[in-house]
């Protein structure tokens, strides 16, 4: 049986943590930033974990992560 392929778009957006969770970047931080407050932009920095409702589908896209 051939090896499963990793979805390359998912591998660029998500990284697996040692504990089994998957981290992702924040949304709403690319453009139209002038109307957002400094506090709002500050809270959008960094990464978050993928929500448990989406975790199964993200893991299916990255079988070897």
UniProtKB/Swiss-Prot annotation:
Skewed-composition ranges (Basic and acidic residues): 45-54
Alphabetized GO MF terms: structural constituent of ribosome
Keywords linked to the UniProt accession: Ribonucleoprotein, Ribosomal protein
Annotated stretches, region: Disordered: 1-26, 38-65
InterPro entries: Ribosomal_bL35, Ribosomal_bL35-like, Ribosomal_bL35_CS, Ribosomal_bL35_sf
GO biological process, one term: translation
Keyword Cytoplasm: no
Gene3D superfamilies with a match to the protein in the record: 4.10.410.60
Biased composition (Basic residues): 1-15
SUPFAM superfamilies for this protein: L35p-like
A GO CC annotation given for this chain: cytosolic large ribosomal subunit
Family the UniProt entry places it in: Belongs to the bacterial ribosomal protein bL35 family.
Name used for this protein in its record: Large ribosomal subunit protein bL35
Organism encoding this protein: Ralstonia pickettii (strain 12J)
